[in-house]
Amino acid sequence: VASEMKSIESYCEKLQEFPPGNYYKNGEFTQWYQPNWANEIPTDAVSLPKLKKALEDSVHKQLMCDVPYGVLISGGLDSSVIAAIAAKYSKKRVESGDAEEAWWPRLHSFAIGLEGSPDLKAAKIVADAIGTVHHECKYTIQEGLDALRDVIYHLETYDVTTIRAATPMYLMARKIKSMGIKMVLSGEGADEVFGGYLYFHMAPNKEELHHETVRKLQKLSKYDCLRANKSMAAWGIEARVPFLGKEFLEYAMNIDPADKMCSDGKAEKYVLRKAFEGLIPDEVLWRQKEQFSDGVGYNWIDSLKANADEKVSDDNLANAKRKFPIQPPTTKEGYYYREIFDEMYPTNEAARSEEHTSELQSHLNL
């Protein structure tokens, strides 16, 4: 058992992820975490005060920390709400039952983007409103391209969407590390819990919406949580995610999914937005969901595609199945990342261990 594939990849005949919510004993995995909501359709009507308190309690619990900590603000709803709650509790030490003054009197917040990116603008609005010491991490396209190999090495994946979003996060972690911050709170998980992705507008009924939120949650360790965890851990920083706290999930995932439906013109994550109305500025509270890799600057994705077009020929892509018989790439960008991955992790087991679910297909199914 190892925390990273790179330490055992060349020694093992078979590789597999240690599944979340399991323990390992006598040569087999046993699932200890089996919540009712994973197999049943909840029927509890949402209570906005209870939802608000559940998330506040989750953030408060995650602030138990004896090292300097900060918050990540992407400029979207999720991270902004987490940051605002953290700011509320940051003046006292959680370890003392909020009786003692905090060792670090000011909460630091961090955002990253290309010059002029929408995320930087929105994050600054939130930081000013909640009173954090805010740090904008601006990067260039070339800096991002130069970091791709390191990102793939640390994340141990060739998933295109994950690499796109992880690269700016990796660069931001380097800046955070240089300031002595050891732990950060991040906003991953809210989209999965509340049906926050735009395709959830297509959910035909509450049952299908709930099934999809459960599926997304169960895949988080391979995608968003992998990105947040390993991008930060590469620089010795711990990322904590209050939206995925066990106690919070017990409440939020037992909400009747009818209350999460994007019906009657309601925005996605409507109940979350309503629960925290007044905590952050309305222009961010009601801001529409963007992919992290889009929000950091729209030129970022175009530049990644253009870079791959230069590196990978049409013939390369046409013969991808021959070179990569296990989960062959279907785009030049995917081909480029797969080449880098295979240089670092050349065994078939390494390639096979990276499960790549077609999100497009899941959207079509929904």
Predicted ranges, named:
Residues 80-82, 143, 192-196, 201, ...:
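Short catalytic/ligand-binding loop motif for oxyanion handling, primarily in non-cytosolic enzymes
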Residues 49-71, 174-181, 340-352:
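Phosphate/ATP-binding catalytic cores across multiple sugar-kinase/actin-like superfamilies
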Residues 181-191, 197:
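Short acidic/histidine-rich active-site segments
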Residues 43-47, 51, 160, 164, ...:
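Conserved acidic
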Residues 178-185, 204, 209-358, 362:
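Adenosyl-5′-phosphate
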Residues 50, 54, 81-85, 122-125, ...:
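Short amphipathic alpha-helical face segments that pack within enzyme cores
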Residues 1-158, 283:
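Cysteine-centered catalytic environments shared across enzyme families
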Residues 86-90, 201, 256:
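Active-site catalytic pocket residues across diverse enzymes, especially alpha/beta-hydrolases
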